[in-house]
């Protein structure tokens, strides 16, 4: 099917950026079967790029990462007249994402699988495949983020997408420079409504496809609880105050997260918040809000994206959850501990918040920003 003309200014601007892109216009597009990646492919084709579709097969069964996504991605490639390839990543996904996720919940942290998946399952392997198997110099995806090339000391800088409601830079902080330098994000300056309008104008079969509202593993199993129940048997334990006073019971610490207030099943004189998950004692530790705040946290395995590693404290805006509002904090370098010396990213920092924070969750990412630019990020550590 021929690609139609665009109707939005944002779509026209995206096409012009693609036409003016420096270097070779040859790319592998990561196709999930959703509207965002579908429109990305359509824009690249319309801009005159040589495009090949690539879908990563992550899980067996139904869902966006499985049969449904594969079928829709293949249909989009047929509609646009481009090749479609499928790479079986199920074993890697099971080892790198599923098992690590289960281990993290078992150990009392709340992992962030999406950033790890982007680094070790999606972008890295996708670029390797494009370069080695198809001799394609670039990869593209439908993420709402932007890249500025030739920034500080020649680095490839990651920027927020212009649509603040859809910005996905938080999940991309962990990508290395060698990958960022070869990525194309055509939707970085579009809004989601722009994307829907452009997809409809192009007559894409996915134009009205609803978005996934949860982690792909949760969608796959029906809910996050069902996913965890499939891997972790119930383990009854106590819900306690910080002084050890028992106030309730639970059937698994994996069903709780630091900062949680609702769904505790505890009757108390005032609302209680989860402040710690004690895996060794199989306890959920709770406290009133007045005792639940944190003024600092340690961030480990830091990946410096748009700047070199800092050597002195600096003020940043930091986001500690995907949907959280960025807050101001002082970012200070810490010496690497012995356990981190042999790691790929041994950098550690301390974040000191200007105002007390209430959902500082071990295992989640803390991503550092300077305005719209991602400086770097890492994983919140237990202390």
From Swiss-Prot:
Record keywords, A-Z:
ATP-binding, Cytoplasm, Disulfide bond, Nucleotide-binding, RNA-binding, Transferase, tRNA processing, tRNA-binding
Q: Which SUPFAM superfamilies match?
A: Adenine nucleotide alpha hydrolases-like
Q: Which Pfam families match?
A: tRNA_Me_trans, tRNA_Me_trans_C, tRNA_Me_trans_M
Tree of life domain: Bacteria
Q: Which InterPro entries match?
A: MnmA-like (IPR004506), MnmA-like_C (IPR046885), MnmA-like_central (IPR046884), MnmA-like_central_sf (IPR023382), Rossmann-like_a/b/a_fold (IPR014729)
Reactions accelerated catalytically = S-sulfanyl-L-cysteinyl-[protein] + uridine(34) in tRNA + AH2 + ATP = 2-thiouridine(34) in tRNA + L-cysteinyl-[protein] + A + AMP + diphosphate + H(+)
Annotated residues that bind ATP are located at: 30-37, 56, 142
Q: Does the keyword GTP-binding apply?
A: no
In this chain, the stretch annotated as Interaction with tRNA covers: 166-168, 321-322
Q: Where in the cell is it found?
A: Cytoplasm
Site annotation (Interaction with tRNA): which residues? 143, 364
Gene Ontology cellular component terms for the protein in this record: cytoplasm
Here the disulfide bonds are 117-216
Q: Which residues form the active site?
A: 117 (nucleophile), 216 (cysteine persulfide intermediate)
By its UniProt entry, which HAMAP family does this protein fall under?
tRNA_thiouridyl_MnmA
The similarity comment for this entry is: Belongs to the MnmA/TRMU family.
**What NCBIfam families does this protein's entry cite?**
PRK00143.1, trmU
| The protein's role, per its UniProt record | Catalyzes the 2-thiolation of uridine at the wobble position (U34) of tRNA, leading to the formation of s(2)U34.
What protein name is recorded for this chain? tRNA-specific 2-thiouridylase MnmA
Q: What species is given as this protein's source?
A: Synechococcus sp. (strain CC9605)
